[in-house]
From Swiss-Prot:
Region (G5) location: 176-178
Sequence segments annotated as region (G1): 19-26
UniProt EC number: 3.6.5.3
Alphabetized CDD domains for the sequence: EF_Tu, EFTU_II, EFTU_III
Any one GO CC term of the record: cytosol
Annotated stretches, region: G2: 62-66
Species for this entry: Saccharopolyspora erythraea (strain ATCC 11635 / DSM 40517 / JCM 4748 / NBRC 13426 / NCIMB 8594 / NRRL 2338)
Record-given protein name: Elongation factor Tu
Main location as per UniProt: cytoplasm
Domain of life: Bacteria
Molecular function in Gene Ontology: GTP binding; GTPase activity; translation elongation factor activity
Keyword presence, Heme: no
Family membership noted in the UniProt record: Belongs to the TRAFAC class translation factor GTPase superfamily. Classic translation factor GTPase family. EF-Tu/EF-1A subfamily.
């Protein structure tokens, strides 16, 4: 068999397993690495169940999350796969964006069918904008009755459709992660069938460099004789010397200017791109006019807003969060990209209060406008201490 080698030009896709506790997310993740290791050993190391299950903890926006990262390759693509073992870890990951997903494999045990967390995970996936979900109907070896499996499949499809995913069309693949992990060839083939479905159906993500330019401003200083420089890490897109840009946020109106120089590590460049830490020299703008918390963008692509709806996770006391609940008109700081802005919280109708450890929807009114799009993530802070994390789901004004 010809050796497949790691090609830089293979598309890179972020994927994850979601679903109810004990339905087999982690076993499936391990089984995928085993089956691919057996098929293309030079491309894929095998990652045993224990390694994924004992995922290291990591911090995202001040929140500790246990999450496992494994990598593997099919013939078509290179995948980074995340598996959050605990339900709370999954919720926190989705809201903080510790690991972004271009697509998700919803794991449902054929023996149980959809359970409460199955629904909650799908709802969250929609709210945080996971573009595509397909289904692994796991433990299929344990159900002999074809009618029962068909019924479970129908329930899962209805659940996906209810959350505006194309439930009628998504692939539902019957697998036994445990049997595949134990080396059963027939069930191993079903894992390959699942991966083929992932290859074929999860869309190629838009590359960060293809998106419109945006750089959050971290610092501003003036260089005598040259003008004002703003520094930061380019979040998306590319910037070329002599391109027009706007500075958006904090102020009522955007400031228009031209980038006359791009500098990285004290060297002048023609272009800066997503991921680069750069200094941008800007024409005709005084240092006092610009501040941290504004963003530099391609003109007309991003607007400043003060009112939005969000899905948030509030840290539990054990995680270093609040010890007490909060109520309507709670006024914390909202930390967007590089700066804190105070905002007033309105809770959904019927929600009296929010307890530490809860996730909830809320409306927020900021005292200063911030450049935002739906999907923007933020931390909720009190006196510099993180007490929650959230994601903008809808912008009002």
């Amino acid at each position: 068999m010809a050796k497949a080698k790691f090609e830089r030009d293979k598309p890179h896709v972020n994927i994850g397993t979601i679903g109810h506790v004990d339905h087999g997310k982690t076993t499936l993740t391990a089984a995928i690495t085993k089956v691919l290791h057996d098929k293309h050993p030079e491309l894929n190391p095998f990652t045993p169940f224990d390694e994924i299950d004992k995922a290291p903890e990591e911090k995202q926006r001040g929140i500790t999350i246990q999450i496992a990262h494994v990598e593997y390759q099919t013939e078509k693509r290179h995948y980074a796969h995340v598996d959050a073992p605990g339900h709370a870890d999954y919720v926190k990951n989705m809201i903080t964006g510790a690991a972004q997903m271009d697509g998700a494999i919803l794991v449902v045990a054929a023996t149980d069918g959809p359970m409460p967390q199955t629904r909650e995970h799908v709802l969250l996936a929609r709210q945080v904008g996971v573009p595509y979900i397909l289904v692994a109907l796991n433990k299929a070896d344990m159900v002999d009755d074809e009618e029962i499996i068909e019924l479970v499949e129908m329930e899962v499809r209805e659940l996906l459709s209810a959350q505006e995913f194309p439930g009628d069309d998504v692939p539902v693949v019957r697998v036994s992660a445990l049997k595949a992990l134990e080396g059963d060839a027939e069930w191993g083939d079903k894992i390959m069938e699942l991966l083929d479905a992932v290859d074929e159906n999860v869309p190629d993500p838009e590359r960060e460099t293809d998106k419109p330019f945006l750089m959050p401003i971290e610092d501003v200083f003036s260089i005598t004789g040259r003008g004002t420089v703003v520094t930061g890490r380019i979040e998306r897109g590319v910037i070329n010397v002599n391109e027009e840009v706007e500075m958006v946020g904090i102020k009522e109106k955007p400031l228009k200017t031209t980038v006359t120089g791009v500098e990285m590590f004290r060297k002048l460049l023609d272009q800066g791109q997503a991921g680069d830490n750069v200094g941008l020299l800007i024409r005709g703008i005084k240092r006092e006019e610009v501040e941290r918390g504004m963003v530099v963008v391609k003109p007309g692509t991003t607007t400043p807003h003060t009112e939005f709806e969000a899905q948030v996770y509030i840290l539990s006391k054990d995680e270093g969060g609040r010890h007490t609940p909060f109520f309507n008109n709670y006024r914390p700081q909202f930390y967007f990209r590089t700066t804190d802005v105070t905002g007033v919280v309105t809770l959904p109708e019927g929600t009296e209060m929010v307890m530490p450890g809860d996730n909830t929807e809320m409306s927020v009114q900021l005292i200063q406008p911030i450049a935002m799009d739906e999907g923007l993530r933020f931390a909720i802070r009190e006196g510099g201490r993180t007490v929650g994390a959230g994601r903008v789901t809808k912008i009002h004004k």
